Amino acid sequence: MLVKIYTDGAARGNPDGPGGYGCVLEYVDTKGELHVKEISQGYVRTTNNRMELMAVIAGLEALNRPCTVEVYSDSQYVVNAFNQHWVDGWLKKGWKRGKNEPVKNVDLWKRLLSAKGKHNVTFHWVKGHDGQPQNERCAELA
């Protein structure tokens, strides 16, 4: 089954201000009927990047069986981590980045990899606040 997950995260006073995430999951069943699920949550102290990660995690963790998943995000941080193979490099270096610095948000990256594991996931960057209905809805939820 193909599931499309649209995500967005936001934080005010970044870092350590209030924030939240939103995600919209869509799939079409065998009868051709569209199903939509919305997920969102807020936090008192967080960062924008943590909320971007949580949006993807929440979407993937909501799936109850292995799926083909297309993730649509305006976060280059999340999309490039997979499409430019940053995560592969971090894993090889023991969760270190260039100059041997620790990867930020490693707790959420590990959780995302675990949630992603049983699915065939592709990541797509979309321009934020550009009128794409699902992503605009995610921004509202966040």
Predicted regions and their residues:
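RNase H-like nuclease fold core
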Residues: 1-50, 54, 61-67, 82, ...
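RNase H catalytic domain
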Residues: 10-16, 57-141
